[in-house]
Amino acid sequence: KSTREYKLLNMINQKNWFESIHQSNPPKDIMFGVLNKRKKLIGVTGLTYIDWKNRNSEISIYFSTKNWQAKPEAKEVINLIMEYGFEELNLNRLYVEIFSLMKENVKLFKKMKFIKEGQLREKIWRQNKWWDTLIFSKLAKEYKK
């Protein structure tokens, strides 16, 4: 639907991906499970496409619930992954690529003071039409404010 995955998400592909992220050194992806207060897994988040030389990475977030962006946990998860990326890994730039049809995601990252860097016109085909993708980022110096 509105996921950026281009491969079918099934157990075999997920297992292969999970094994591959543990084989690269330094890692190009670092992922974490997201638990609710009852310790139930409700999603995953992490840093993907980590560019160690240029110190930047994409933030990935997948939740099992609809409208996760409106939940208080959404901001908490983004704040934690920013803290990890900027403070623990000493990255300079974290970014997200969001489909323009995912209006709640756009709203959330704007609210979190990510800066819109660009727009890739008609990059994806969903719901029988072309959609743009939007790039938002935050720099380490903006995070520390």
Predicted regions, residues:
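Acyl-donor (CoA/ACP) binding surface of acyl/acetyltransferases
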Residues: 31, 35-145
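Conserved GNAT-fold acetyl-CoA-binding loop/helix
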Residues: 1-19
